[in-house]
């Protein structure tokens, strides 16, 4: 250990002595960015650690994450004249946005008459009336312009014969406020829409003078007196620590699917932004709502897009029955994802699953023309062959619900500003924004509609940039930062680097994932959730006995995975405790011991004569969760759902009703 510490000091002394940053890889990589961004603005600081080199940077804005939301926010800010840094642990085109398949919703009306208000209605209904209707109004009204903007950026959308953007059917989408049949609203690039969107946004970002700090792992927010003043990050390439001081910080770090054993998420989906906010003493919102995508490949968990069913694919049980006709007579296989996942689970439970163990169902595509499969679903055809050994033109795909998306996240308003709830009012956290899957506006409520996620990314990434441009002016003088700001983050990094317990990071992570998978699944019960809370408390405490093996600082993936596990753990405990506390079934949160939705009124009956339940006695409200990082103890509070649209005359709010498809 002494030798390692000495090596760290040598690196620190070398950087400190030269008083200017080495041009790491700028000459070698020949990319559009400098690894250290605008080097003239960077200064060496010795106020945090003598062992770890600490470099200070000043920007108007810093964006954490470079997926769809992060890129859209970053180049939107640069376009508006803000000196912007984008800090990302991955090269931008490696972000998980690249894995999205199905498409992006917008009421363009290319296939039939459509209206964004019908999209608004479907999204509110899909959220099981937990979505904030002002934010849903904003997103759905902005959707057509957002898609046209992407087209102007060069996104190669699939086309109809007459050259318009092709739009496919997707789950939970209807015409005429649910009374006009299935809508075709999902704009797509075959079944690789996320790939095209991410590369389009990345290509667009090259037009602007944004400083990209690639393969930098964000550790924590720099908070002072309730205001966010930037972030502190680890440069994984050389082990130096960087403090990014900025008047505006945008979190776009994605979801935390890797808290579960079977999921469609990349291994980098570790909820880093949620965890940073939690450690800053701020709440996360609605983390109990975890979406299980109906069609993950059995045994692998790889995503099979909902677009398969949008193109005409059907789900089949062991009796050869198209069973969704029983559960959703109108929408059938294109009911919302929570409905389809529960229906599949019931079929398997009741003995109508397929395979030797009758533990999954089939997705049938071979009745569709091969030309259609080749043109509209080329990626799925390849994925099914690689991961299931299935030729989709001849055989069905074995599928099973798998964790796919987190409806909850960092609470924001529709402008992207992070909020807290005190004294019956929402309060903006100065200098802090969130968007994408990390944020919770809340446009998805208790259940996200397919193809609303990519829309969420571009609309609210742009909204963050617009809000900052409206409030601030580029080049404003920054308030001073305490010399030791970020000291606790560096101390934690050092502690994890030299952790010498008896349990590997991978072992603790697996215990967490299996606990979450078995205790917070598609169907939940009070006893199982309580047992899960107890087990997660034990798993959380086991972090005190963690052991890391790599004592280096350059590309120490053991250290980074351990820091990611800390982040996952904070997300996991909030998820399962929030789920145990919510005594109802709503959207993706299905309780077998509380099967009904508990609203302020019983909306299955006439409202006349009913007495409104007090806020404390119903569950149509957002969960706000706080964690003590030292103990893992979770504290819950609640805030009301926003039931009004942005303009009642232009778009009437949708009152709660019984949700059926």
Curated annotation (Swiss-Prot):
UniProt keyword Aminoacyl-tRNA synthetase present: no
Pathway, per record: Carbohydrate metabolism; tricarboxylic acid cycle; fumarate from succinate (eukaryal route): step 1/1
Modified residues (Tele-8alpha-FAD histidine): 96
GO cellular component, as recorded: mitochondrial inner membrane; respiratory chain complex II (succinate dehydrogenase)
Gene: sdha
Keywords annotated in UniProt: Electron transport, FAD, Flavoprotein, Membrane, Mitochondrion, Mitochondrion inner membrane, Oxidoreductase, Transit peptide, Transport, Tricarboxylic acid cycle
Family note: Belongs to the FAD-dependent oxidoreductase 2 family. FRD/SDH subfamily.
Keyword Aminoacyl-tRNA synthetase (UniProt): no
Protein purpose: Flavoprotein (FP) subunit of succinate dehydrogenase (SDH) that is involved in complex II of the mitochondrial electron transport chain and is responsible for transferring electrons from succinate to ubiquinone (coenzyme Q). SDH also oxidizes malate to the non-canonical enol form of oxaloacetate, enol-oxaloacetate. Enol-oxaloacetate, which is a potent inhibitor of the succinate dehydrogenase activity, is further isomerized into keto-oxaloacetate.
Activity regulation, short description: Enol-oxaloacetate inhibits the succinate dehydrogenase activity.
Main location: mitochondrion
Membrane disposition: Peripheral membrane protein
Molecular functions per Gene Ontology: electron transfer activity; flavin adenine dinucleotide binding; succinate dehydrogenase (quinone) activity
Binding partners and assembly: Component of complex II composed of four subunits: a flavoprotein (FP), an iron-sulfur protein (IP), and a cytochrome b composed of a large and a small subunit.
PANTHER family: SUCCINATE DEHYDROGENASE 2 FLAVOPROTEIN SUBUNIT (PTHR11632), SUCCINATE DEHYDROGENASE [UBIQUINONE] FLAVOPROTEIN SUBUNIT, MITOCHONDRIAL (PTHR11632:SF51)
Residues reported to bind FAD: 66, 69, 88-89, 95, 97, 102, 218, 272, 437, 453-454
Alphabetized Pfam families for the sequence: FAD_binding_2, Succ_DH_flav_C
Lineage: Eukaryota, Metazoa, Chordata, Craniata, Vertebrata
Species: Danio rerio
Superkingdom assignment: Eukaryota
Enzyme class label: oxidoreductase
Subcellular location(s) of the protein: Mitochondrion inner membrane
SUPFAM superfamilies noted in UniProt: FAD/NAD(P)-binding domain, Succinate dehydrogenase/fumarate reductase flavoprotein C-terminal domain, Succinate dehydrogenase/fumarate reductase flavoprotein, catalytic domain
Name this polypeptide is given: Succinate dehydrogenase [ubiquinone] flavoprotein subunit, mitochondrial
């Amino acid at each position: 250990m002494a030798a390692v510490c000495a090596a760290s000091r040598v690196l620190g002394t070398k950087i400190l002595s030269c008083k200017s940053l080495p041009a790491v890889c700028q000459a070698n990589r020949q990319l559009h960015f400098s690894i250290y961004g605008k080097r003239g603005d960077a200064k060496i600081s010795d106020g945090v650690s003598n062992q770890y080199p600490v470099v200070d940077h000043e920007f108007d804005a810093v964006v954490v994450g470079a997926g769809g939301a992060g890129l859209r926010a970053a180049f939107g800010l640069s376009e508006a004249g803000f000196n912007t840094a984008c800090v990302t642990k991955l090269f931008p085109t490696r972000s998980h946005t690249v894995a999205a398949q199905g498409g992006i919703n917008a009421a363009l009306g290319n296939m039939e008459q459509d209206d964004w208000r019908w999209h608004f209605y479907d999204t509110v209904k899909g959220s099981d009336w937990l979505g904030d209707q002002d934010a849903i109004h904003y997103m759905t009204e902005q959707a057509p312009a957002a898609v046209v903007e992407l087209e102007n950026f060069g996104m190669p959308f699939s086309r109809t014969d007459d050259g318009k953007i092709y739009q496919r059917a997707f789950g939970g989408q209807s015409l005429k406020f649910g009374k006009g049949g299935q809508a075709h609203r999902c704009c797509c690039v075959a079944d690789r829409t996320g790939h095209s969107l991410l590369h389009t946004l990345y290509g667009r970002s090259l037009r602007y003078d944004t400083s990209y700090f690639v393969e930098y792992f964000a550790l924590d927010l720099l908070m002072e007196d309730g205001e966010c003043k930037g972030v502190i990050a680890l440069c994984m390439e050389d082990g130096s620590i960087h403090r990014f001081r900025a008047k505006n910080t945008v979190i776009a770090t994605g979801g935390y699917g890797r808290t579960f054993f079977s999921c469609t998420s990349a291994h980098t989906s570790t909820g880093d932004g949620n965890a940073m906010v939690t450690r800053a003493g701020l709440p996360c919102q609605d983390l109990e709502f975890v979406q299980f995508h109906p069609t993950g490949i059995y045994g692998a968990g790889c995503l099979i897009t909902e677009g398969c069913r949008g193109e005409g694919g059907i789900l089949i049980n062991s009796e050869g029955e198209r069973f969704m006709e029983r559960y959703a007579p109108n929408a059938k296989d294109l009911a919302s994802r929570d409905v389809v996942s529960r229906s599949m689970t019931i079929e398997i439970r009741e003995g109508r699953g397929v395979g030797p163990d009758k533990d999954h169902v089939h997705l049938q595509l071979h009745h569709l023309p091969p030309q259609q499969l080749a043109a509209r679903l080329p990626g799925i055809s390849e994925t099914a062959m690689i991961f299931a050994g299935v030729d989709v033109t001849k055989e069905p795909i074995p599928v099973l619900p798998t964790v796919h998306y987190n409806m909850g996240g960092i609470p924001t308003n529709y402008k992207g500003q992070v909020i807290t709830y005190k004294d019956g009012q929402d309060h903006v956290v100065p200098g802090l924004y969130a968007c994408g899957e990390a944020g919770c506006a809340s446009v998805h409520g208790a259940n996200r509609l397919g193809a609303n996620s990519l829309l969420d990314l571009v609309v609210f990434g742009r909204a963050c940039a617009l809000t900052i441009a409206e409030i601030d002016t580029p080049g404003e003088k920054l308030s001073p930062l305490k010399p030791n700001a970020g000291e606790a983050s560096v101390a934690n990094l050092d502690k994890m680097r030299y952790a010498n317990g008896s349990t590997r990071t991978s072992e603790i992570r697996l215990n967490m994932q299996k606990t979450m998978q078995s205790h917070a699944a598609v169907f939940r019960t009070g006893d199982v959730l309580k047992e899960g809370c107890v087990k997660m408390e034990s798993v959380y405490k086991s972090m005190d006995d963690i052991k890391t093996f790599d004592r280096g600082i350059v590309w120490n993936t053991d250290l980074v995975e351990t820091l990611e596990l800390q982040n996952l753990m904070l997300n996991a405990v909030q998820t399962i405790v929030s789920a145990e506390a919510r005594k109802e079934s709503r959207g993706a949160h299905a309780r077998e011991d509380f099967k009904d939705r508990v609203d302020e009124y019983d909306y299955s009956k006439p409202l006349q004569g009913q007495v409104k339940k007090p806020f404390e006695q119903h569950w149509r409200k957002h969960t706000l969760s706080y964690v003590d990082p030292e103990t893992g103890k979770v504290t819950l509070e609640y805030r009301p759902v926003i039931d009004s649209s942005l303009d009642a005359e232009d778009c009437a709010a949708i009152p709660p009703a019984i949700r059926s498809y």
